[in-house]
Regions:
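Mature N-terminal segment immediately following signal peptide/propeptide cleavage
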Residues: 18-37
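Short secondary-structure junction/hinge motifs that connect adjacent elements
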Residues: 40-61
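Residue-level recognition of alpha-helical structural elements
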Residues: 19, 48-52, 97
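Internal helix-loop-helix
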Residues: 61-110
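A structural motif shared across PLP-dependent enzymes of the aminotransferase-like
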Residues: 27, 50-54, 75-83
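A generic secondary-structure micro-motif detector
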Residues: 20, 44-46, 76
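Generic non-transmembrane alpha-helical segments
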Residues: 32-37, 58, 62, 89
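Intrinsic disorder at enzyme termini
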Residues: 1-22
C-alpha cells in the first residue's frame, strides 16, 4: 500500500515552494500590512459602511498599489504573481479592501 501524501492546510496547493524570494518578501509585507492595519478596523468600517479612503495613502506607502507598474513610473515593477499575492493577503481580511486596492492599481495603468 502506498504511503499517504502529506497535506499542509496552510498551503494546500504548495504555492510557497513555487515562489521566488522577491515574491515571498512582497507577500509577507502585504500580510503584515493587512494584519496590522486592516484587520483591526475591518469590523468598524463594515458596520459604519465607511469608504476608508484614508487607507489609500497607507497602502501606497506600503507599496501595495501599482505593484506591476514599472519603477520609473513609481511602481514596484514586480510580477503579476506578486500582484496576486498582495491581493490575496488583503482579501484575506476583506474583499472590499481588496477591491479598493485592485481598482486603484488598475486605474494607474491607464
Amino acid at each position: 500500500m502506498a504511503a499517504m501524501a502529506s497535506f499542509d492546510w496552510a498551503d494546500p496547493l504548495g504555492l510557497d515552494e513555487q515562489l521566488n524570494d522577491e515574491e515571498r518578501m512582497i507577500r509577507d509585507a502585504a500580510r503584515g500590512f493587512a494584519q496590522s492595519v486592516l484587520q483591526p478596523r475591518v469590523i468598524d468600517d463594515f458596520a459604519a459602511e465607511a469608504d476608508a479612503s484614508e487607507l489609500f495613502p497607507l497602502m501606497g506607502e506600503a507599496g501595495l498599489l501599482g505593484v506591476t507598474v514599472p519603477e520609473e513610473y513609481g511602481g514596484a515593477g514586480a510580477s503579476y504573481v506578486s500582484y496576486g499575492l498582495v491581493a490575496r493577503e488583503i482579501e484575506r481580511v476583506d474583499s472590499g479592501y481588496r477591491s479598493m486596492a485592485s481598482v486603484q492599481s488598475s486605474l494607474v495603468m491607464y
